[in-house]
């Protein structure tokens, strides 16, 4: 269960926020040092630690759902590339996967990833490549039917070349979209991370053929200097 922030500073350094500065160690690239310094000073990283979430990405799906309301009690959700499980921590209580909301429908959460994921009550994690032949049928079998939501925070390994990374993640996102077409219930929702860079127009065209509404959203918790956005497609036509 996520811990509630106490509002107290227990660092012993007084009651004001401190900016952490990281020295560049011998053998460490300057870019790595900058990333580490940004990570240590990121308010969402600090908040995730305080509230018991597995990563800052939890706030992204939280903010998207606050706006579009797709994680509702009784929803059957598939999370592609679910590690480390931060999105699951947000989704499980919202879809009532544990049945804690009396009188509300009980949802199902299936997370799949190439790596093993630490267990979480109310979530069902499986090691599976969603691009494998028959993966869609396997997921539907686990769900006991079609999904109401397919969501993805996946990103291809960074090459250090912006345009290459953009094309890689767009290819991954398009593959996830085709997976969603196979497993979504009519009226369902597809949510996926994209990187701006020019090729996202083709994905938009594809999704507009299959969904009633398609939006590009940059949630507040996405870093301002990042090209990251999320596509939220609602009203799957089947």
UniProtKB/Swiss-Prot annotation:
GO molecular function, one term: rRNA (uridine-2'-O-)-methyltransferase activity
The keyword Ribonucleoprotein is assigned to this record: no
Active site: 193
GO cellular component: cytoplasm
Keyword presence, Methyltransferase: yes
Enzyme type, top EC level: transferase
Broad class of where this protein is predominantly found: cytoplasm
EC identifiers of the protein: 2.1.1.166
InterPro entries: RNA_methyltr_RlmE, RNA_MeTrfase_FtsJ_dom, rRNA-MeTfrase_E, SAM-dependent_MTases_sf
Keyword entries, A-Z: Cytoplasm, Methyltransferase, rRNA processing, S-adenosyl-L-methionine, Transferase
Catalyzed chemical reaction(s): uridine(2552) in 23S rRNA + S-adenosyl-L-methionine = 2'-O-methyluridine(2552) in 23S rRNA + S-adenosyl-L-homocysteine + H(+)
SUPFAM superfamilies listed in its UniProt record: S-adenosyl-L-methionine-dependent methyltransferases
Family statement drawn from the similarity comment of this UniProt entry: Belongs to the class I-like SAM-binding methyltransferase superfamily. RNA methyltransferase RlmE family.
Function: Specifically methylates the uridine in position 2552 of 23S rRNA at the 2'-O position of the ribose in the fully assembled 50S ribosomal subunit.
Protein name (database record): Ribosomal RNA large subunit methyltransferase E
Organism: Ruegeria sp. (strain TM1040)
